[in-house]
């Protein structure tokens, strides 16, 4: 290590496994930005469920070991590399990706994945924008081709992506239905864009949704737990309806016949299949929402960096998650 190299605290993963493989190190070198790169002093980093799958080694994208998790940071620009003209030291920013990892006191990001954070949003909220809001945009507009006047059911609406989908869909003129598993979650879903909310722990909630949507059915379903809900989703759709799968934790058996009569479709969402141009389109939508005030990230559980393993444990095993889980530096 070069003499005088600045050091930071960061979470490092040296082997795939359970939450216990997240190790705090205090002697990690602060990265130096190269061309088209931005170094950010991290104030908060969002935790996404997919990061637990990556950590366990079971996800389709496996990073080289060792690595630092985290994509959604919010903070202040510390320094910039050559050919960066959009940002300067001191700018408040958030990201949709990082090069060096976000569970750290400093994070390196490519300049095209960095966006300005308005003063009206704090750093915790900034750390809740990246994957949740960009995924919701991709699900609604790229995958579902949703448009004003249609109906959307956000199946599992109280988490980060679900609340983002409710806010965006409401702002764009859709009729929004949501589900949540707790009274608190239902209240938050109604406060963030849903016209109606249903308790998905109620044994008869599917019947309640059917009563609400009538014979026509619902046009779009944004599905957060497909391995539990997909079969029921197909029975709720309108003719030409679309189920968009954002989350899944296992397999499920469905009857393909349920897709035939209504010519319904099932599509998956992978945010990082988006092109740079698509990311910019999503960013324009979200930045407009920030300016107009309908992008309002809801913060759930908050943890210090040292409790990252506990955060990973809770984000998967705690029931009734409300809002976005964040690490604070």
From Swiss-Prot:
Its EC number is 1.6.5.5. The modification N6-acetyllysine is found at residue 23. The keyword Ligase does not apply. Gene3D superfamilies: Medium-chain alcohol dehydrogenases, catalytic domain, NAD(P)-binding Rossmann-like Domain. The keyword RNA-binding applies. GO terms for molecular function: identical protein binding; mRNA 3'-UTR binding; NADPH binding; NADPH:quinone reductase activity; structural constituent of eye lens; zinc ion binding. CDD domains: zeta_crystallin. GO terms for cellular component: cytosol. GO terms for biological process: protein homotetramerization; quinone catabolic process; xenobiotic catabolic process. SMART domains: PKS_ER. Its main location: cytoplasm. It is found in: Cytoplasm. Does not have alcohol dehydrogenase activity. Binds NADP and acts through a one-electron transfer process. Orthoquinones, such as 1,2-naphthoquinone or 9,10-phenanthrenequinone, are the best substrates (in vitro). May act in the detoxification of xenobiotics. Interacts with (AU)-rich elements (ARE) in the 3'-UTR of target mRNA species and enhances their stability. NADPH binding interferes with mRNA binding. It is linked to A genomic mutation causing the deletion of 34 amino acids was clearly associated with a hereditary nuclear cataract in a line of strain 13 guinea pigs. Belongs to the zinc-containing alcohol dehydrogenase family. Quinone oxidoreductase subfamily. This is Quinone oxidoreductase. It comes from Cavia porcellus (Guinea pig).
């Amino acid at each position: 290590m070069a003499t005088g190299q600045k050091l930071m605290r960061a979470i490092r993963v040296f082997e795939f496994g359970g939450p216990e493989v997240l190790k705090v190190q205090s002697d990690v070198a602060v990265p130096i930005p190269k061309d088209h790169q931005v170094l950010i002093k991290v104030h908060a980093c969002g935790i996404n469920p997919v990061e637990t799958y990556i950590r366990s080694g079971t996800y389709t994208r496996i990073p080289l070991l060792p690595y630092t998790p985290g994509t959604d940071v919010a903070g202040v620009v510390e320094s910039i590399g050559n050919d960066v003209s959009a940002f300067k030291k001191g700018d408040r920013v958030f990201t949709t990706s990082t090069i060096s990892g976000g569970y750290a006191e400093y994070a390196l990001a490519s300049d095209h994945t960095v966006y300005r954070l308005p003063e009206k949003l704090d750093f915790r909220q900034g750390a809740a924008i990246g994957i949740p809001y960009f995924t919701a945009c991709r699900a609604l507009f790229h995958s579902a081709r949703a448009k004003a006047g249609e109906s959307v059911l956000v199946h599992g609406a109280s988490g980060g992506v679900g609340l983002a989908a409710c806010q965006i869909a409401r702002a764009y003129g859709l009729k929004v239905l949501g589900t949540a598993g707790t009274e608190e979650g239902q209240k938050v879903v109604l406060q963030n864009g849903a016209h109606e909310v249903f308790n998905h722990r109620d044994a008869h909630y599917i019947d309640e949704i059917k009563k609400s949507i009538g014979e026509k059915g619902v046009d779009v379903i944004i599905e957060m737990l497909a391995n539990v809900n997909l079969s029921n989703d197909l029975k709720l759709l309108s003719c030409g309806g679309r189920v968009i799968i954002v989350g899944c934790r296992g397999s499920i058996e469905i009857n393909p016949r349920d897709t035939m009569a209504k010519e319904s479709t099932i599509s998956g969402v992978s945010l990082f299949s988006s092109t740079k141009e698509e990311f910019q389109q999503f960013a324009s939508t979200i930045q407009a929402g920030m300016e107009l005030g309908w992008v309002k990230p809801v913060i759930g559980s908050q943890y210090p960096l040292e409790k990252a393993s506990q955060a990973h444990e809770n984000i998967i095993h705690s029931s009734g998650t409300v809002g976005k889980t964040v690490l604070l530096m």
